[in-house]
């Protein structure tokens, strides 16, 4: 037998037992007559002692070095009282080695487990990086999450059904990864961006509760929390309303947090998209941050200051304030830095006012814009934002979207910089009632979620007549400023689906070409259905406390969508390309 116990599982209950351990040398210390090693496996670390009592094992241990793969047979003994290590889970015990077997020696590592390694080093030698205890713990947590999800889904009547990986390209927002067909030369499969249409078809097939933990692929520009291939917890239901779907999924996530880290998330508040954007400048607000954005256009619409009065009198403009309690200590240099920061989001500037004495009216205000205000306007502003002595007010004034984006980003930055965001808290919520459509860069209407989302309380005729007023029957789950899951009630009426396609500029010929199978299926007694998908990678990222999604994926890609370890993507064999009837054009 190669192993009877895991290293990290040993404790006082094992004292006196003979054990067989297999793992790696994490650290070695030679004290002359004694040799100690910290031995590591996926479960943790335990101290092993080589004593002259077992001379053969002691002699063999002299040749051990870090990362040798070994087997130890020995007895679990109590550590002397003065040698107990309270920082280790196994710190009350050690193993007295009786036999040592070296499975394999190790070259000097290109990584240093005790130092910060570059991201490139970690990804190139990922198989070594994954040996680090913190990385092993993250992947164990990921496995625990998927086990919990499967149990929950089974207990609630959901069926785990697989959907195809080789499918048809459909417009879902990002670019597809294409796979050429050898049999059907000149034609391509697409790797799925999500199982969206297949799970809807399963509802039409009568499988009223579906789930799948599934790989998805999107060829898009990457960020720290994005990967070209990622994993979704995909869910779809029939004959359930949006609140009923949210209730089931909230119970799942509530249970997941309790099971994984012992945290009770409580009841999730529900907030409309409009309220989230108005108060927090984001459709995924971080509620750990107490700062809020307050509209003041009605107060400043008549001031002699174009920066304020023009957007205040423009239906598409916005003037808003963030009050920072005790923020008057912020320096002019910091204010200049914040002004530069909001410029990233299109803001032309950042007005500010320090409240040195709230009882002194304008006399108690220090601000370059004070000269444009009068006592009545200042009093109304101070009351609206509940200004107090020692506060600072930051003003944003521009088009609605620019002001909202800039002030939302400033709110987050102020929360971090000033230590206002309560990092030890968990703040979940549901955001609902998103706009059905938004304008793209060319000014055309695009689906805010996807073209299969149902509008709320709109007929096809009403939708076609006034699409920009439509509210989507959609919902996102947000935790600490991260969208961890999103979904909607789906369109189940063929007339409504064709109407949405037309609004999006997809004519009847394109509808048949791209979605003919869906439009046909909708004709045969389609049930009302709704669902959502969670990002497993992002959930794991939150539950393990890392800010980089690559830390919770065993073999991730870089931000350039490359694998440094295997050197993928690579050039294809010319013969394979010939069989696929593909000719590669070299870029200049």
Curated annotation (Swiss-Prot):
Catalysed reaction, written as an equation: tRNA(Asp) + L-aspartate + ATP = L-aspartyl-tRNA(Asp) + AMP + diphosphate
Similarity annotation: Belongs to the class-II aminoacyl-tRNA synthetase family. Type 1 subfamily.
Binding site for L-aspartate: 172, 218, 449, 490
Ranges where the record places region Aspartate: 196-199
GO cellular component entries: cytoplasm
E.C. code: 6.1.1.12
Listed name of the protein: Aspartate--tRNA ligase
Keyword Protein biosynthesis: yes
GO molecular function per UniProt: aspartate-tRNA ligase activity; ATP binding; nucleic acid binding
Chief location: cytoplasm
InterPro entries per UniProt: Aa-tRNA-synt_II, aa-tRNA-synth_II, aa-tRNA-synth_II/BPL/LPL, Asp-tRNA-ligase_1, Asp-tRNA-ligase_1_N, Asp/Asn-tRNA-synth_IIb, AspRS_core, GAD-like_sf
Keyword Cytoplasm: yes
Source organism (scientific name): Haemophilus influenzae (strain PittEE)
Listed CDD domains: AspRS_core, EcAspRS_like_N
Function: Catalyzes the attachment of L-aspartate to tRNA(Asp) in a two-step reaction: L-aspartate is first activated by ATP to form Asp-AMP and then transferred to the acceptor end of tRNA(Asp).
UniProt superkingdom: Bacteria
Binding site for ATP: 218-220, 227, 483, 535-538
NCBIfam families assigned: aspS_bact, PRK00476.1
PANTHER family: ASPARTATE--TRNA LIGASE, MITOCHONDRIAL (PTHR22594:SF5), ASPARTYL/LYSYL-TRNA SYNTHETASE (PTHR22594)
Keywords: Aminoacyl-tRNA synthetase, ATP-binding, Cytoplasm, Ligase, Nucleotide-binding, Protein biosynthesis
Subunit and partners: Homodimer.
One Pfam family in the UniProt entry: tRNA-synt_2
GO biological process annotation, one example: aspartyl-tRNA aminoacylation
Enzyme class: ligase
Location of the protein in the cell: Cytoplasm
